[in-house]
A protein has these predicted regions:
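Short, cysteine/histidine-rich loop/knuckle motifs that typically chelate Zn2+
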Residues: 1-4, 22-23
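Nudix hydrolase/Nudix homology domain
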Residues: 9-14, 55-60, 124-171
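N-terminal strand-loop-strand
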Residues: 16-62, 66-67, 88-89, 93, ...
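Accessory, usually C-terminal, subdomains that scaffold auxiliary metal cofactors
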Residues: 57, 83, 96-97, 117, ...
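Hydrophobic alpha-helical positions that pack around
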Residues: 63, 77, 81
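Glycine-rich phosphate/ribose-binding loops and adjacent secondary-structure elements
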Residues: 69-73
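Active-site-adjacent beta-strand/loop module that shapes the phosphate/pyrophosphate-binding cleft
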Residues: 98-122
């Protein structure tokens, strides 16, 4: 929204979409906030979390977070998983991305495996209210996603055995 007049419209400028104020002509070049969403697997289990101190905290989530300056997406995956649930991961696989329009976020979806046998979750209680390993079978029986968000899609793919590690195993 224009800081001068409080209005905005989306227009094309030199082949790019920008925000422009129809009153004063002020042009705003929105920035993109890259982030990751991470499906951490451990055999037939998927790590699910719930956000703390946020509206909708009852909803199921995957580990997620923003990429920091000079950090690769893969480094973000390792850092966010360690910060939020205290686990090391390996075998990262890029899945796909999902833009979140007005907020300027773009989420890069990744699959990864737990590195090692210690699956003890150490929650960052500031960001998360809960974290648990949920079996593929339990997800098949009980999970109903919204069908829109990348989180929902990745959980459904895991439940159906279409995550990259299950597909490798079944070749």
């Amino acid at each position: 929204v224009c800081g001068f007049d409080g209005e905005i419209e989306i227009v094309e400028h030199d082949g790019k979409l920008i925000w422009r104020c129809p009153k004063c002509g002020n042009m705003i070049f929105p920035r993109i906030n890259p982030s990751v969403i991470v499906a951490v697997t451990h055999g037939d289990y998927l790590l699910l979390t719930k956000y703390a101190n946020r509206p909708g905290a009852q909803r199921t989530a995957l580990v997620a977070g923003f990429t920091e300056f000079a950090e690769s997406f893969e480094q973000t995956v390792h850092r966010e998983v360690m910060e939020e649930v205290g686990l090391k991961v390996k075998d990262l696989r890029y899945y796909r991305c999902q833009p979140w329009g007005i907020s300027g976020n773009i989420m890069m979806g990744y699959w990864c495996r737990l590195d090692g046998d210690d699956d003890t979750i150490h929650l960052d209680n500031f960001e998360l209210a809960d974290g648990a390993w949920v079996s593929r079978e339990e997800l098949r029986e009980n999970y109903t996603g919204n069908g829109i968000a990348l989180t929902s899609e990745m959980i459904a793919e895991f439940a159906a055995g279409r995550d990259p590690y299950s597909l490798e195993k079944n070749k």
